[in-house]
Amino acid sequence: MSSQIKQVFARQILDSRGNPTVEVDVVLESGAFGRAAVPSGASTGIREALELRDGNKALFLGKSVYKAVENVNTKIAQAVKGLDALDQRLIDKTMIELDGSENKKNLGANAILGVSLATARAAASHLRKPFYRYLMDVKEYLMPVPMMNVINGGSHADNNVDMQEFMIVPAGFDTFSEALRCGTEVFHTLKKVLIADGYSVAGVGDEGGYAPDLPSNEAAIEAILKAVKEAGYEPGKHVFIALDPASSEFYKDGKYELKSENKSLTSEEMIDYYAAWVEKYPIVSIEDGLAEEDWAGWKLLTEKLGNKVQLVGDDLFVTNPSILAKGIEKGIANSILIKLNQIGTLTETFEAMAMAGQAGYTCVVSHRSGETSDTIIADLAVATCSGQIKTGSLSRSDRIAKYNQLLRIEEELGENAIYPGIKAFVFNSDEEVEEDVQEIIVEDSEAEKVVVQVEE
């Protein structure tokens, strides 16, 4: 039976914050079916592809997405009907040209992405392949090391912590399932630690982490390391720390305003702030350590810490190949966060990952703070052998769904599932890359060859 697209249908559903989002169904002539739901961010980069919302305050406080749904059911459906779902590049190119804008503002990135992902899922169903294997069919796969957001602050929580995410990284294990067990034990122990220290943990933030009112940002790290030890693990051996300050959120008039500590820091002072932490704590990754428009500061940050920790660009690069290319040229950061809805198609996502891999940058596949039960990023992380994933804490079913999908994939792959551990964190330095680092060249229907560096 044919793999041509027969039907495309979108609807409005709710995300994990109770806000409307887009869900798309795609049916092929063969009867194969694919469905995808689009996530949404809270702290968003100024150069992200546009998420189209209606703005009518009488409907969902202005957050409804009926126009995006209508765009899928009319303009996009008419344009892609009859196209071969196995030709992902053609599908995405057709929608990009139909939109005609640089940031997908006409049709909406949420409309375009929903169709892009649902089509890929339908194609995988048509070929009767697991989605990760449809994206990349090889013998061995890297399971991603999870960055688990156990203390939430900033835009993700209602507390006085400036920085957005304090994450545990269980990299000192041989399998993903062992790492996940460690993460859950540390997470539950952290609750006991916070309560014993007199903090309220009655609720959790958008990504499932605790959101206590701590006296300083550093207090979050201290609490986490205490929980790691009380759970029976060793910091720097079994569990490491990753940070996402989301510093664009507290960058005002050229200064970094840490209100919880009553500090106003220049770029150089903010870099020194991080450098002191890197010397003191087992930190392996800092995401958006400086503001997205502070490129001069980013250059200094990379020069000072780029050979010591992973420096991830999220708001900095917004999964955009053209912006990433500029960052690579200027020697800024050494890693990119991959968020599907920042760029709006599967093809462009693969292009960004390919470019990053070729430049020696790592890729961290990521969720958004407004998530759904869709598990597509779990498959994406495995398929691309990115080696790292951010999908929240160890609570809230929208986060756990991704972890459970990774457990299923690891079980299915058996001995062909490789957990890279600390080797997933490759920093740009003057040292030669070890000879056992190999390049896996991935040829798929979504994009050009994807190059991913893998250490075994």
Curated annotation (Swiss-Prot):
Residues the entry annotates as binding Mg(2+): D244, E287, D314
MF (Gene Ontology): magnesium ion binding; phosphopyruvate hydratase activity
The active site annotation covers E207 (proton donor), K339 (proton acceptor)
Q: In which pathway does it act?
A: Carbohydrate degradation; glycolysis; pyruvate from D-glyceraldehyde 3-phosphate: step 4/5
Q: Give the cofactors, semicolon-separated.
A: Mg(2+)
What class does this enzyme belong to in the EC scheme? lyase
Q: What chemistry does it catalyse, as a reaction equation?
A: (2R)-2-phosphoglycerate = phosphoenolpyruvate + H2O
Q: Name one GO cellular component term.
A: extracellular region
Binding residues annotated for (2R)-2-phosphoglycerate, in chain numbering: Q164, K339, R368, S369, K390
Entry keywords, A to Z = Cytoplasm, Glycolysis, Lyase, Magnesium, Metal-binding, Secreted
Q: Where in the cell is it found?
A: Cytoplasm; Secreted; Cell surface
SUPFAM superfamilies on file: Enolase C-terminal domain-like, Enolase N-terminal domain-like
The protein's matches in HAMAP family, at most eight in alphabetical order, are given as:
Enolase
According to the record's subunit comment, the protein's assembly and interactions are: Component of the RNA degradosome, a multiprotein complex involved in RNA processing and mRNA degradation.
Give the similarity note.
Answer: Belongs to the enolase family.
Function in brief: Catalyzes the reversible conversion of 2-phosphoglycerate (2-PG) into phosphoenolpyruvate (PEP). It is essential for the degradation of carbohydrates via glycolysis.
Q: Which PANTHER family match?
A: ENOLASE
- This protein's name: Enolase
- Origin organism is Francisella tularensis subsp. novicida (strain U112)
